[in-house]
């Protein structure tokens, strides 16, 4: 069943006109999972509740986000695709029986919804980083090529497993190591990204000014 759901997700993803995503390193996936739990109020040892996060936490960070619960009788996306996230509409769509079972704590359905929640969170992160032009947080942006989307689905599975079972994020690490890996290093990268962006913009502005002055000088000499 999980394999069928996975294949159905790939087929759906490659149809998206805006199926762009962040391609993360292993450290990036760990960082995403750690901060996902932190911002969702789970900390390092709390229980991650994807339905609660979808309904209450994500809207706090992204006002454009929405979700839809569709009755099984009206579900036209195939038998095996039980839920999906569409980045173009910024919406999670879930079949109602899957939603109800997830509320009841059925593990497979909890994982299914958690997977889509992680997709949404990755989309939020991507839009934020694109807006800040902080490219150090990502290794590449991939289009809706089927092989690339397959990699993205595997990446999302990995982050989802870390979000639901976070022991490996902090296991064997001291408090100082956790602070360094998940707080200090990302902050340094973020600040460096901002400085690089500011410097690039300044150089472009100076070049534009020099070009403008050269044109004016040519015009003056011509007169």
Where are each of the predicted segments found?
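Juxtamembrane/interface and other helix-to-disorder boundary residues
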Residues: 40, 48, 87, 101, ...
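Active-site scaffold of zinc-dependent metalloenzymes
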Residues: 70-107, 117-124
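Long, well-structured alpha-helical subdomains associated
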Residues: 148-153, 161-223
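Hydrophobic or amphipathic, alpha-helical segments that drive membrane association/targeting
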Residues: 1-78, 142, 146
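Post-HEXXH active-site segment of zinc metalloproteases
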Residues: 107, 111, 123-157
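A broadly conserved amphipathic alpha-helix scaffold signal in soluble, globular proteins
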Residues: 118, 158-162
């Amino acid at each position: 069943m999980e394999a069928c759901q996975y294949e159905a997700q790939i087929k759906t993803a490659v149809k998206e006109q805006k199926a762009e995503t962040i391609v993360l390193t292993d450290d990036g996936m760990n960082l995403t999972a750690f901060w996902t739990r932190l911002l969702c109020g789970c900390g390092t040892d709390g229980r991650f509740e994807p339905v609660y996060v979808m309904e209450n936490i994500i809207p706090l960070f992204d006002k454009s986000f929405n979700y839809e619960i569709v009755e099984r009788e009206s579900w036209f996306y195939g038998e095996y695709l039980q839920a999906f996230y569409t980045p173009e509409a910024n919406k999670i769509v879930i079949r109602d029986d899957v939603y109800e079972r997830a509320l009841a704590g059925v593990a497979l359905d909890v994982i299914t919804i958690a997977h889509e929640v992680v997709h949404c969170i990755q989309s939020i992160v991507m839009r934020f980083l694109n807006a800040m032009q902080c490219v150090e947080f990502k290794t590449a942006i991939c289009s809706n090529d089927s092989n690339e989307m397959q990699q993205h689905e595997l990446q999302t599975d990995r982050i989802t497993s870390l979000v639901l079972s976070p022991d490996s994020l902090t296991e064997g690490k001291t408090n100082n190591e956790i602070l360094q890996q998940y707080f200090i290093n990302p902050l340094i990268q973020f600040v460096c990204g901002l400085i690089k962006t500011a410097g690039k913009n300044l150089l472009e502005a100076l070049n534009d000014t020099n070009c403008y002055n050269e044109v004016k000088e040519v015009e003056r000499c011509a007169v």
